[in-house]
Amino acid sequence: RKNLGSFMFNGEDVFKKINVLSGGEKVRLELCKILKKNPNLLILDEPTAVLTPQEINELMQIIRNLTKEGKSVIIITHKLKEIKAVADNCTIIRRGKYIDTVLVEKTTEDDLASMMVGREVNFKVDKEDAKPKETILEIKNLNARDTRNVQILNNLSLEVKAGEILGIAGIDGNGQSELVEILTGLKKADSGSITINGNEILNDKPLNIFNKGIKNIPEDRHKRGLVLDFTIAENTVLQRYKEPTFSKNGVLNNEAIEKHAKSIVEEFDVRPTDYTVKSRALSGGNQQKVIIGREVDNIRVDKAKTNQPQLLIATQPTRGLDVGAIEFVHKALIEQRDEGNGVLLV
């Protein structure tokens, strides 16, 4: 309690299991462990990647306090507001090369972004007004419990129309993850109704839900989006490898898979362009491009087959990405909306 007291843990929290701590609590706990050794230099690598806005503000204040106490802090981040909030100097590295070191107070966010990406970055998403059409996803009176058997979704109802992006906002732990798991078939609901293009999918199998029109950019690209030890090419056909285009009699058609991967790599500017590289070797932004490219391609294929709009679920799609990759993700979601599909943005 003594060690954790200054990091906003109350007395009861010290008895919590680690697996139930929030992202912010885990980061603060790691800081406590480090600071107990009284280091002179702290290196924080993307410390806010899984934090809420409130937790980020709290961490920024902790960092300020540490520097006032004479500690030196190196914070590795791509988030411009965090650089402006706590850094005195900023060194920019792009593709493994040193670009420049600047005084933060004399450098604008636009200048930092340009140095990071190597070009001018558009922070404003250019988009026309939405033109919503028919309802493609309808949820009625959905009820579900979390892993602690606590009611997490309580008579939830919503609709997503073709040609619109519906956003779901809220702090982590308020049912968003459970909703997405239910929509993709990874979790069972207690009751309610979910239809996609008029087809009931409540508690259906994941592959059936996928085939009926729901595609997913998951929150955790490492656990749910990619098989990290598979190549880029193999990851582009995760849901479709059994189709005749990509396999015959249980044997994969590597030539067809690689041709398919090449088109995705080129269209979505995945780097490196070598689709035989394991996905583990890619940066976070390029891993996300592989996932988005795969799901957009899945949407095109199934839309052509069924002549029905598809639903793309995107959960925290820009988490952990640099400003250039964030710009790419925003444009990709807008394009899906403009092509007449629905987007559920969590």
Language-model features: locations:
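ABC ATP-binding cassette signature C-motif
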Residues: 1-44
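Glycine-rich phosphate-binding loops of nucleotide-dependent enzymes
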Residues: 45-346
